[in-house]
Amino acid sequence: AMSASELADRLDASSQGSALIRSKLEVRSLEGAKRVLQLQIKQRRTKTTTDLAYQVLWPDEHKGEAVILHQAQGAATGLIIVPQKPVRAIKASEMNEGLFDSDLSYQDAVENFFAWKKQALIGSETINGVSCQILESKPDSSSASIYAKVRSWIDPQRFVPMRIEKYSSSGELVRRIDVTRVARDEKHNPIPASLTVHGPRKNSVTEFNGARIDQDVSFTDADFTPAQTL
C-alpha cells in the first residue's frame, strides 16, 4: 500500500499542468432561489505555483467579471475584475470569502493541500460505494492556508478525492466538498468533474458542473493579468 506522502505526491502530480475549462456554477439557497453562472477557467499548476483565472461568460449582466488567483510559496493573492470599475486586490483577510459569492472560497480554489509536507493516513471509509483512504493534510505554516487541516477521502484506484473536509484551528468543520461525478480527461485520466460545496453559510449550497476541459493549451503569465480578461 502507498504511504501518505506517496499518495499525496501522486495526487499533486495529477493536478499539475494547464487546462481551459468550461464550468457551470450554481448557488442554491434553502429558500429555493437559484443563481447560475457559466464560467471559463484558465488553470496552470506546477509543483510550486498555481495560477487561475475565472471569467463569467453568462449571464450578460455579469459578463466579463473575473477573478484571478495566484499562489506560490507563501499566502495566496488575487484580483477581482468588474467591467467599468477599478481592479481590486483581494486582501489576505478576504481569502475565505466566496468565489462569485458562492460557497467555495478563493482559498479553496487556489490552494493545493496535496503539496503540503505534513500528510498522514488516518483511516478508511466507503463513500458512494467507493472504498476510500482518508488523508489528513496540514499546512507547512499558518500563513499558507486559512485552514489548520484538510481531510480528503481518496479513491486509491483512480487517484481522485471523493470528499474533502476543511477545518479551522479550533477544529470546526468549515467546508465540505463532495465530488458527485468523476469524468475522464483528454488523456483518459479520471478527474473530478462535478462538485457540491457546503460552507460556513448554512442557508446555501454550491454546485460546480464541469462541461468541457481542454488540456492542449499553453498559457503565459500574461494570461493571468487583468488585460487578458477584460
Language-model segment annotations:
Residues 44-104:
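An acidic-aromatic
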Residues 79, 88-89, 99, 104-108, ...:
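Gly/Pro-enriched, hydrophobic low-complexity segments
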Residues 44-50, 123-131, 185-187:
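Short, ordered beta-strand-loop transition motifs
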Residues 2-9, 37, 62-66, 133, ...:
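Charged, amphipathic alpha-helical segments
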Residues 16-20, 36, 49-51, 75, ...:
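Extracytoplasmic
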Residues 9-11, 37-44, 66-70, 123, ...:
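Hydrophobic/aromatic beta-strand elements that line small-molecule binding cavities or substrate pockets
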Residues 1-34, 40-49:
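N-terminal leader/targeting segments and the immediate start of mature chains
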Residues 22-28, 57, 136-140:
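Generic short beta-strand segments
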